[in-house]
UniProtKB/Swiss-Prot annotation:
PANTHER family: 26S PROTEASOME REGULATORY SUBUNIT RPN14 (PTHR19857:SF19), MITOCHONDRIAL DIVISION PROTEIN 1-RELATED (PTHR19857). Keywords: Proteasome, Repeat, WD repeat. WD repeats lie at residues 101-140, 143-182, 185-224, 299-341, 345-382. One of its GO terms (cellular component) is proteasome complex. The gene is paaf1. Belongs to the WD repeat PAAF1/RPN14 family. Inhibits proteasome 26S assembly and activity by impairing the association of the 19S regulatory complex with the 20S core. This is Probable proteasomal ATPase-associated factor 1. Interacts with proteasome 26S subunit ATPases. PROSITE patterns: WD_REPEATS_1 (PS00678), WD_REPEATS_2 (PS50082), WD_REPEATS_REGION (PS50294).
Length: 425
């Protein structure tokens, strides 16, 4: 079934940004930086901030044009900024880890579920496993060629999955630093991968327009799930999604077909993919059937638009897609005929949509990153940006990870930015 829409409710999300290195004010008796309030896409209020050291533990921040800045006395990396009845919590990195002496550019990163180990991939085809506490390198993983665009841990925290522009995926022992297997089958660079259950099976997506279901123990392809004419940019595997989708949306059911004995945990799972062609697709992992293709037709248009979707996610009853023009579309998974909402805070591409911490005080919230260096926490009940992670100066966010009340950001440089004690997660 192909979905479309003629009218989509639109909400612009105002936000405040402050100079990326604002926290350096604490190292000087006085300092100046800039602050900006984006009221909508065309109107921005620019202000300047002057900081003054009162004593060893207290600083005063003064500004113009209606800005009010309130530093957190218990956490110098946190400051609240207000303007025009709008308020946002902004965090600076607690620490910044510079990898390989600043000689490498980070293209991807993952963190273990306990937050003790991290792994980053770079443009030279290598990955390095490091301790998140001090940045000490534990293992170097060498075997890819070209940019490593995927780096993630399995739930055990002992196994790493990587994918590169060389079209291959690799499974690594994070402790020993050895490559356990290589998955070969794509003919374009790897863009995304999602584990099925605990990780006996996985789904990979590529610039070749295909998504594949793999059996990891045998390094073999179980099924070719999709074949598009342009790249697949992101993927997400959801559980229990099929229970909410009307049965009429599923076509050409293969329920009577014999299930491949290599499949583990695919029953009840749905794959969501974000396509360069400008749509999302939902695919039943067990039957391999497409459940729905979620297109966007703007009011007054006669055909679907072709703006690329770069990111996708499933949150509560929402299927969410972020596109190349900065729009974030929401579908109700019980009705995929059309998006029920479009949010926007930038014209830059949306690159990541992630769940908030499972222990969050703000349950109905998601993290979103963009190509101009923004990393925001969105409160979906209020349609409001409530938290911002500073530290990247208008460059693309290449990876975002959240573990507990900690977050990790990377850009196209050699710095891993680590944030701690975030209030809203």
């Amino acid at each position: 079934m192909t979905s479309n829409t003629t009218e989509i409710p639109y909400h612009f999300l105002p936000y405040v940004r402050i100079q990326y290195d604002w926290q350096l004010a604490y190292k000087q008796d006085s300092d100046n930086c800039w602050v900006a309030y984006q009221k909508d896409l065309k109107n921005t209020i620019h202000g300047s901030v002057h900081s003054t050291k009162i004593d060893e533990n207290n600083f005063k921040f003064e500004s113009d044009y209606g800005f009010k800045l309130t530093p957190n006395k218990e956490n110098k990396n946190n400051i609240r900024v207000e303007n025009d009845k709008y308020s946002i919590e902004i965090y600076a990195p607690e620490k910044q880890l510079k990898v390989s002496g600043g000689k490498k550019r980070i293209t991807s990163m993952g963190v273990s579920h306990l937050g003790e180990l991290g792994v980053y991939g770079s443009t030279d085809g290598t990955l390095e496993v490091f301790e998140t506490g001090d940045g000490q390198i534990r293992r170097k993983l060498d075997g890819h060629v070209g940019d490593v665009d995927l780096a993630m841990f399995f739930p055990s925290g002992r196994v790493i999955l990587s994918g590169s522009s060389d079209s291959r995926l690799k499974i690594w022992d994070a402790i020993e630093g050895t490559c356990a297997s290589t998955l070969v089958g794509h003919i374009g660079g790897i863009t995304s991968a999602s584990l099925v259950d605990r990780g006996r099976n996985l789904v990979s997506c590529s610039r070749d327009g295909t998504s594949k279901l793999w059996d990891i123990p045998t390094s073999s392809i179980i099924s070719n799930l999709t074949k598009l004419s342009r790249p697949i940019n992101d993927s997400f595997i959801a559980s229990s999604l099929l229970d909410s989708i009307p049965t009429t949306t599923t076509t050409n059911s293969n329920d009577n077909n014999k299930v491949d004995e290599r499949e583990v945990g695919t029953d009840g799972k749905t794959l969501i993919i974000a396509a360069e062609e400008g749509f999302l697709q939902a695919i039943d992992l067990r039957s391999k059937n497409m459940i729905s293709q979620m297109n966007v037709v703007q009011s007054g248009e006669k055909s679907t638009r072709s703006v690329a979707f770069n990111a996708c996610h499933v949150h509560k009853n929402y299927i969410i897609g972020g596109d190349h023009n900065g729009s974030i579309y929401f579908w109700d998974k019980r009705n995929l005929n059309s998006p029920f909402c479009r949010l926007q805070f930038t014209n830059s591409p949306i690159h990541h949509i992630k769940a908030n911490s499972s222990n969050s005080k703000i349950a109905n919230s998601i993290w979103v990153t963009s190509g101009d260096g923004c990393c925001f926490l969105l409160d979906l009940d209020k349609n409001q940006i409530i938290t911002s992670l500073s530290g990247i100066d208008t460059d693309v966010v290449t990876s975002f990870n959240i573990v507990g009340n900690q977050a990790y950001l990377t850009s196209r440089d050699s710095i891993i930015r680590c944030y701690n004690n975030l209030l809203n997660i």
